[in-house]
């Protein structure tokens, strides 16, 4: 039964028919952190000048029937309220309410699904899941789950641009090589040629996070490299060394990521004084580590920026990449632990239909 549920794609149509042809199409990717702050996220999609002008939304970490997110169907509820078509691919059937502060959510899970989605103003065709495997046994630890990470891909009939899109969340609890292998599985599941965009949370932290021990060893390696040097040359530029295989793989398949992203710009941050982050990490990182983390980040106000959300584009011209910090930074509570990212896509001569 669980396997059948996890293999079932959910789709719905709420968009008006016949949206117009445009000189460029706006794509937004945002990790919604389960949809815990759904009401604020919906308001942002409705009213923020950039978000409300999107044509395609690649949303990751969306719940269905989880207590932590009000037992909503996050992707469907967003699509209905925003007048969009949607496709949702479940990744996990959760056997608990979550980890860290999520375990304290009131009520119980009514369904317990979690996954990734595509929302679109234009018709979604041939939506399909792309299983990409786990980097760690999800039955270990407090948040016990059945299933595996799954990307969701679809063909979108944009006027003037026949585009394949893929909403991606690479496994946070994984090695660098496993993230590269997950991206290869995604690329193997997409057409070998033609216009395409891959977007989402790639978790390019530079760390081997498959275990607490590996993460702690990696932390000390980065301390020896120097915190400032590590932040500038690795955390904000993961493609330079630790995650280079993933980015080179994309280039070998004809995908352009350099022009599709605002380089050197953070999309999330670790704040050593954030109580929620501290509680979540405390479940698998020993308490003594936090004093050393504070020491390493003492010159950076206890904050460590990371660039882990990305686009890669093939067969279309990327333009004007953005990172929107205001939903996360300086907002209590933040709408998500990730920034939204965006890009405009212009058809090139080969992509006309």
Regions inferred by a protein language model and the residue ranges of each:
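Active-site environment of divalent metal-dependent phosphoester hydrolases
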Residues: 35-37, 64-67, 94-97, 137, ...
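Active-site beta-strand/loop signature of hydrolases that rely on acidic residues for catalysis
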Residues: 26-32, 45-71, 91, 119, ...
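Metal-dependent phosphoester-hydrolase catalytic domains
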Residues: 1-13, 129, 190-197, 204-353
């Amino acid at each position: 039964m669980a396997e059948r549920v996890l293999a079932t794609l959910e789709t719905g149509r709420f968009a008006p028919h016949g949206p117009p042809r445009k000189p460029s199409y706006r794509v937004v990717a945002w990790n919604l952190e389960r949809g815990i702050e759904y009401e604020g996220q919906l308001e942002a999609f409705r009213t923020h000048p950039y978000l409300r002008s999107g044509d395609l939304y690649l949303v990751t970490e969306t719940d269905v029937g989880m207590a932590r997110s009000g037992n909503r169907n996050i992707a469907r509820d967003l699509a209905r309220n925003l007048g969009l078509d949607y496709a949702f691919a479940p990744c996990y059937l959760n056997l608990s309410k979550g980890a860290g502060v999520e375990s304290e959510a009131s009520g119980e899970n009514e369904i317990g699904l979690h996954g990734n989605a595509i929302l679109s103003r234009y018709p979604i065709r041939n939506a399909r899941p792309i299983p990409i495997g786990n980097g760690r046994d999800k039955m270990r630890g407090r948040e016990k789950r059945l299933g595996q990470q799954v990307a969701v891909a679809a063909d979108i009939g944009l006027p003037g641009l026949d585009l394949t899109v893929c909403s991606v969340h690479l496994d946070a609890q994984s090695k660098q090589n496993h993230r590269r292998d997950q991206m290869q599985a995604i690329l193997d599941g997409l057409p070998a040629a033609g216009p395409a965009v891959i977007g989402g949370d790639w978790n390019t932290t530079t760390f081997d996070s498959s275990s607490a021990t590996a993460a702690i060893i990696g932390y000390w390696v980065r301390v020896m490299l120097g915190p400032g040097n590590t932040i500038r040359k690795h955390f904000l530029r993961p493609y330079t060394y630790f995650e280079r295989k993933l980015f080179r793989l994309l280039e070998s398949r004809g995908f352009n990521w350099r022009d599709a992203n605002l380089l050197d710009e953070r999309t999330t941050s670790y704040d050593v004084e954030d109580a929620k982050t501290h509680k979540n990490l405390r479940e698998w990182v020993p308490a003594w580590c936090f004093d050393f983390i504070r020491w390493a980040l003492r010159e950076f106000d206890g904050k460590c920026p990371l660039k882990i959300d990305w686009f890669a584009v093939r067969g279309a011209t990327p333009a004007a990449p953005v990172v929107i910090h205001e939903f996360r930074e300086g907002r209590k509570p933040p709408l998500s632990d990730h920034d939204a990212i965006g890009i405009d896509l212009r058809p090139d001569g080969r992509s006309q239909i």
